[in-house]
Amino acid sequence: MLLRWYSIILITLLFVGCGGGERARLANPNTSYIPLVGGPGPEEGGYDSISYWDGDGVAGPPSIKIYLKEQRAYFYKGDQLVGVSQVSAGREGFNTPAGSYRLVQKDKDHASNLYGDYVDALGNIVRKDVDLKKDAKPPGAIFRGAPMPFFMRITGGVGMHEGYLPGYPASHGCIRMPGKMAQKFFYNVDVGTPIQIVD
């Protein structure tokens, strides 16, 4: 009899542990996660248990809230949360500016005009990860801007785009996102979409 009760309790606990799922936890912006540090970003095959999209077929005006401390972006249609993305915002000294903005530009195939590589005439990298403000061009080299696919300009030189996510703020001020999420955000916003960036 005692064994039967233990079995019932064990089965009940198993079912309770399965309830809610990932999305129930992600819908609460106060939920904390331990980020993957030092590994590849989600677009490079790493596991991303944070990002999701449920906005297809949902009506309502788009808006985005980015929480820098959480390194998360939340996509809303009307008042409904339809997507969450892991992000990597600006590192120390290149902080992503907090504030309220409206999307000013969309460029699917954008490349940086400030950060990238110096390459030779054949496209071989001569000097990697250069900053045009600081790094002199070697003789015969040309500048190739860092690719920023699905670029959504927020203000000045800051935008959201597909990029590497190491699990902490690492960019020059932009908000990097996994490729699948950059695409979803890109195709669901228009110029003028409100974006709020919170410290």
Where are these regions (language model features)?
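Pocket-edge structural micro-motifs
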Residues: L68, K77, Q105, G156, ...
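Structured segments of extracytoplasmic/periplasmic soluble domains
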Residues: D79, K106-H110, K184-N188
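Sec-dependent bacterial lipoprotein signal peptides
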Residues: M1-C18
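Exported/periplasmic cell-wall-interacting domains
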Residues: C18, E22-A24, P29, F94, ...
